[in-house]
Amino acid sequence: MGMNWYFVGVDLGQSHDFTAIAGLERAELTGEWDPVVFAWRKRIRLGLRYLERVPLGTPYPDVVERVVRVTRSPELAGRCHLIVDATGVGRPVVDLLRRARTECNLIPVIITGGEAEGISEGYHHVPKRDLIIGLQVLLQGAGLQIAAGLEHGPKLVTEMAEMRVKVTSAGHEQYGAWREGVHDDLVFAVALACWGARKVYPNAPSGENAHWRFEGATLLGY
């Protein structure tokens, strides 16, 4: 079995929106020998292991402290990536996280309404549609496990069901909850973590580790 890596996604809320923290585990599992391709079968398993919704009104320094505590979990030490929504108020929080010296590689993301990814001054610019569709593909293709017993697991499923795409008069797509008063913080925290896993590991390894497949049930325990 290869080393497991962890991806912590943080969607930062404002006065009327929750902040959400998601912890994703990427496990590389070795299966049986395949004589046809002359390689060991490998399985990449993505599992949502942690999901937290920070109470409304929590000051950003306290949010940073909470994120730091999560990243300093012994299981994550030296093998995690922290993907943070740096859109809007997120930049000052990213600066606080940098000064806090988390145990993770920090990847700030600015969520855009565009169509192409890019990077500028250390900030990744990622279309909202890429985050949402990427998560939907994983769920529909059984590529993401959601651990049973997560308090906010059912809320995540509800948020995904509430997501809609709206086409503006200019022909641009907008993704979000289809009615007011519905939150989407859990969806984006998980989507950021999943995006991070795909960004850091975009391709299957070559050579003797080239034979991969995804495994996982869409939901565990719900």
Labelled PLM ranges:
Residues M1-I110, E117, H125, R129, ...:
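RNase H-like, metal-dependent nuclease domains and their acidic two-metal-ion catalytic environment used
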